[in-house]
Regions:
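Long, histidine/aromatic-enriched segments associated with O2/redox biology
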Residues: 1-295
Length: 295
C-alpha cells in the first residue's frame, strides 16, 4: 500500500471490486498476491507499481484483526432526492497503480488468477492520468492532497499501518458541463480553471466543491489522501474513479456528508448538480502487508 500512497503522480490505475465466495481461501490468496506484486516490482522497478488489498466490513469483521478498524462499516447511501451517493458495498477492493499500463494489467491478471473462484468480480475500472493532472472537467484534480512522504503516511495510515478507503465512481455529463460558462464552472469548483488558484473564502460560493470538501474541525483539517483518476470511454460512460485513503473514516465521511447535504445547512456540492452523478460507493479497510500475511 505504501507504493500506492507515495506515488503521487501515477499515470494509470486499475480498481477492482469483488465479493468473497470462499472466505477460507482468502489468506493464502493474499500472500500469493503480495508475492505477485513483488515479482512485478522486480521486473519493472522503474514503473513504481503498487497495490492495495482492502476489505469490506462483512468480511473484515470476521477476522482476528477486526479491532484494528473500529470505524469500519458498510457504505450507507448519502443525500436525498436527485443528489444521492448510492451504496454498492463489496467485500474486496484491489487497487493497482503505476506509471505503466502493461505492468498494471499484468499484475491484475496475476492477482485475479491467485484469488480464482474464491471471489466474484463485480466491477473493474481502468483509470488514466490526463495532461497537467486535470480531470475530464479540465480542472486540476487533487490539489488539496498532502504532499511529501511524512505528511502522506501520517494522513493515510493508522497506528496499525492500515487505512480506511473510500471507492466511488462519478459519471460525468460533459455536454451539460460545457453549457456552463467558465465563470460558472469556476464557481462550481472554487478555483481558477486556467491557473488553479484557489478563490478567497470571502468570494467562494458555499456550494463550491472546495467549500464542501476542504473541511476543518476544531481548527484541524480533515485531510485525506486521494489517488483518483479519470476513467471511461469517449463514446460511453466516463468520469472520475474516486479513491481516498485516511487514518480515520470520519475524515472521509464528513466530506461526503457535506457534499451530499447531510449536514445542518443542507447545501449540496455544485458539481453534483452541474457535472457528476455518483454511481457507486463502498468503504474498505486496507491492512498492512504484515497483517495481510497473517490473516
Amino acid at each position: 500500500m505504501d507504493n500506492i500512497l507515495l506515488n503521487e503522480h501515477a499515470q494509470f490505475g486499475i480498481f477492482i471490486e469483488a465479493d468473497i465466495k470462499q472466505a477460507n481461501q482468502i489468506q493464502a490468496a493474499c500472500v500469493k498476491a503480495l508475492d505477485c506484486l513483488a515479482a512485478i516490482q522486480a521486473k519493472f522497478p522503474q514503473h513504481q507499481i503498487g497495490m492495495t488489498l482492502a476489505f469490506g466490513a462483512n468480511f473484515w469483521q470476521s477476522t482476528q484483526y477486526a479491532a484494528q478498524s473500529p470505524e469500519l462499516k458498510n457504505f450507507p447511501s448519502y443525500g436525498k432526492n436527485h443528489t444521492i451517493a448510492p451504496a454498492t458495498q463489496h467485500d474486496l477492493l484491489i487497487h493497482i497503480q503505476s506509471n505503466n499500463y502493461d505492468a498494471n494489467f499484468t499484475l491484475a491478471l496475476d492477482v485475479l488468477a491467485v484469488f480464482g473462484s474464491a471471489i466474484d468480480v463485480k466491477n473493474e475500472t481502468h483509470g488514466f492520468r490526463r495532461y497537467e493532472e486535470r480531470g475530464l472537467d479540465d480542472f486540476v484534480d487533487g490539489t488539496e492532497n498532502p504532499h511529501g512522504d511524512e505528511k502522506i503516511l501520517s494522513t493515510a495510515l493508522d497506528e496499525h499501518g492500515g487505512s480506511y478507503v473510500l471507492m466511488q465512481r462519478f459519471a460525468h455529463d460533459l455536454s451539460k458541463w460545457q453549457q456552463y460558462s467558465v465563470a460558472e464552472q469556476e464557481e462550481s469548483i472554487g478555483r481558477s480553471k486556467e491557473t488553479n488558484e484557489e478563490f478567497d473564502k470571502a468570494i467562494r460560493h458555499p456550494r463550491s466543491h472546495l467549500a464542501r470538501s476542504n473541511l476543518k474541525e476544531n481548527g484541524v483539517g480533515l485531510k485525506i489522501v486521494r489517488r483518483s483518476l479519470p476513467y471511461g470511454t469517449a463514446s460511453g460512460e466516463h468520469g472520475l474513479a474516486f479513491i481516498a485513503y485516511a487514518a480515520r473514516l470520519h475524515n472521509i465521511e464528513a466530506q461526503l456528508q457535506h457534499m451530499f447535504g447531510d449536514v445542518e445547512d443542507g447545501l449540496t456540492d455544485f458539481l453534483l448538480e452541474r457535472l457528476s452523478q455518483a454511481i457507486s460507493g463502498a468503504y474498505y479497510y486496507a491492512p498492512s502487508k504484515e497483517t495481510l500475511r497473517r490473516l
